[in-house]
């Protein structure tokens, strides 16, 4: 119905333009009659009524807010516009099906606050299912109805063009009428002036008969000039009018050609729109099938959502029970904690009160323990010292025996040394005698002094040999005696000093540990 009204309006526009083109060459009368024809046409009213009837649909009003975005691109739709359009489409669906909907969604309330209506729809699963389905389908619907809106835009453009052509023709008519009236006034004024001049000449002819010929000649000349000027002016005016008519005829012809081309384009667009309407019908059938499937899926989803809601309700109730139990446990723990805090405070006071007493007792016990330990250590030290002294006395006895043996050995060695010395002295004396005898036998001329000096040299030699022998004997004696002295004196003395050092170090460590323990207890 809407497409037929729109096409009929376009056909009326084309007929009007054709009438304008046909009357373009008829002059003033043709233009006036064409303008009267335009003024009496009711095609524009029919077109406007068709457009208003098409725009009064509820769904079209609901989609009016997103019409520019639908025409220029679906991606230009904002979330708020999508939400508002989905709400309006849901209300249109409720009204078309005769269903009741919340009071918050009535026009007087939802125009003030859209969110109130959406919150009211959310309370009912059926309303919310319709709203959510329309919210998701707004962009698809916008894409599907974009072509009819383009058709509506084209029709509005053609309507504006018709009004523009009407205003142009009215302007042409008014300008032509004004120009014709001005031209007639100019010619009338010129003829009035001419007639006044002729009257003056006729009156002066009776008065001045002598000057008639001269005046007539002058008048004739002036009249010829005036007539020629008037003819020139009239010719120029006629030429200007013809030029304006030709220019206007060319404009009208151009407008007629353009409107004819636009009519062809409109017919082509009408055919395309018819094909698209058929495709849209097919798409609507598919969409209805998909909507039925979607409705079934939404019902299943609603059932699952109800189950999930019931499960969540039970879970929330169990969580509330757990929270209450936890709250009771926390309160009980807080009471126990307060009791423990009081007990700890009391115990701290008792500790602060009895700490000096306990420290005193510990110090006394520690000192007693240290004294007892020191006495035990001293007794052990005395016992060890006695044992060491006994061992040392035994070692000394053994050493004395060894020294006796050594003394005997030394005595024997000294006797042996004395015998060796005596033997060496006797050997020396014998050797001297033998040397003196030998020298006297070899050299009878040697004096007594020479013999004495030789004997002294020999004695000095044997004395040196004797001393060397004594030194060697003493060294051998020391080498023999040193192991015995070492085993008898140095080893017991080192053992005794080592045991004494162990005992002294133990006593010092115990005293230091006791002092440190007392210091810690005092802190």
Curated annotation (Swiss-Prot):
Gene Ontology CC annotations of this record: endoplasmic reticulum membrane; nuclear membrane
Predominant cellular place of this UniProt entry's protein: endoplasmic reticulum
Residues that span the membrane, as ranges: 470-490, 501-521
Compartment(s) where it occurs, according to its Swiss-Prot or TrEMBL record: Endoplasmic reticulum membrane; Nucleus membrane
Chain ranges on the Lumenal side, renumbered to this chain: 23-469, 522-523
InterPro entries given in the database record: Nuclear_fusion_Kar5
GO biological process, one term: nuclear membrane fusion involved in karyogamy
Keyword Manganese: no
Glycosylation-annotated residues: 160, 213, 361, 371, 386, 407, 429
Keywords: Endoplasmic reticulum, Glycoprotein, Karyogamy, Membrane, Nucleus, Signal, Transmembrane, Transmembrane helix
Cytoplasmic side: 491-500
Signal peptide: 1-22
Domain of life: Eukaryota
Membrane topology: Multi-pass membrane protein
Record-stated family: Belongs to the KAR5 family.
Function according to Swiss-Prot or TrEMBL: Required for nuclear membrane fusion during karyogamy.
Official protein name in the record: Nuclear fusion protein KAR5
Gene: KAR5
